[in-house]
Amino acid sequence: MAKQYETVIGLEVHVELATKTKIFCGCSTAFGGAPNTHTCPVCTGMPGSLPVLNKQVVEYAMGIGLATHCDITRVCKFDRKNYFYPDNPQNYQISQLYQPIARNGYVEITVGDTKKKVRIHEMHMEEDAGKLVHDEWDDTSLVDFNRSGVPLVEIVSEPDMRSSEEVIAYLEKLRTIIQYLGASDCKLLEGSMRADVNLSVREVGTQEFGTRTEMKNLNSFKAIARAIEGERERQIELIEEGKAVIQETRRWDDNKESSHAMRSKEDAQDYRYFPEPDLVPIVIDDEWIEKIKAKQPEFRDEKLERYKKEFDIPQYDAEILTESKHMADIFEETTAICGKPKKVSNWLMVETMRLLKEHGMEPEDISFSPANLAKLIGLTEAGTINSSVAKEVFEQVFEKDVDPESYVEEHGLKTVNDEGALEEVLKEVIAKNPKAIADYKGGKEKALGALVGQTMKAMKGKANPGMVNQKLREMLK
């Protein structure tokens, strides 16, 4: 009988915090600046420069810790992690090992109908390294230190996950929590959220862990899922062939859907950690913790429960709207103005999602105001514009946040409700379409739709489709 294997997965998730300045200096954390323009002696490791801790980093880390049910360490300290690499100018990284900011938390996930708690071992603050830029034509590597010193929180889970589905559910839940806190935008493609996957396999029923590998270069949820499946198969194949799985760090190539070894996987002792001598311990008292708790927002799970009670919208819509705090805020603010939650939900779920997809944008990138969406809904409800014109106007609202009332007025887009003018157009349409008239009178209901379409075209989309339909039926009796 073939052996059955179980996958054991733990994650190290690095989250770039949304502070305006770096963790130990006043340099900007803005993404996309010219190389080496957001630097100073501290973040480039110049001799004699001293770090000064950014308080906002500590408060963001505390917020994430509390939101994931962690115990906040009352006296936390920084440590030096020693290693040599071109993008690490100090030859050490200021991190936390012995007394990190938070420990012993969990995130509850749902896969299918099954709920599960993924435990968090610990969470620590640290500085990011610089970035190596490789020139494939010149065979050289350059270093950009703009990212050096950008604040990170690393969230280390216990090896509680058993499938790629559980991993993605955990990451999505973690991302939503952090985005709701405003602590990070968690964009994988920009590197503000990065996940390293520690994976091993073992025979089903075995308690002892197998030899783990660490997978890096995973910049999308799809890449993470593919890397997990690929590494699982690779390890099982090695075991079946009687070969040893080597403890190592591997780089995933998503184009080739395969990985290659980068280096042997280090343990903590290999980095020769010791206490950071230039930073004093951080003392966290009850008052500070209560202050951070008071700032915690209403999280997604709580919003979902409230939406079920407060707004009469489908469960699926509520789930999509609350995936992004920004989208949920727009929904609630627009609903507060116009009082029509179903209409607001429809505009966000259909037209907004369509335009986001067309423009390659995320919900966090939405820039139109709830007031303008509410005005557009008001125009459609009043019959001032019809649905096709409303979609045209909404594209302008989405792209430029125009005032829909002014736009409709300036471009002459109001629905024509003049029955006399409509009758004149209908007479012309009827005269030009004898076959459609005959088909309709012969019982083909679809023919009426064609006549409505011809009328709407003749009136440049400004007619009321319901009125056109009604008038046509009256005239063709």
Segments predicted by a language model, with ranges:
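Strongly charged, low-complexity linkers/loops
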Residues: 363-374, 378, 387-457
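Short, structured loop/turn "capping" segments at alpha-beta junctions
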Residues: 238, 355-359, 386-388, 404
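M16/insulysin-pitrilysin zinc metalloprotease superfamily fold
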Residues: 337-338, 344, 352-367, 375-380, ...
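Structural motif
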Residues: 3, 312, 335-344, 382-385, ...
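Amphipathic alpha-helical core segments of compact helical bundles
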Residues: 18, 198, 202, 233, ...
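Core structural elements
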Residues: 191-203, 308-330, 341-358, 371-373, ...
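Basic, nucleic-acid-interacting segments
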Residues: 1-298, 309, 315, 336-340
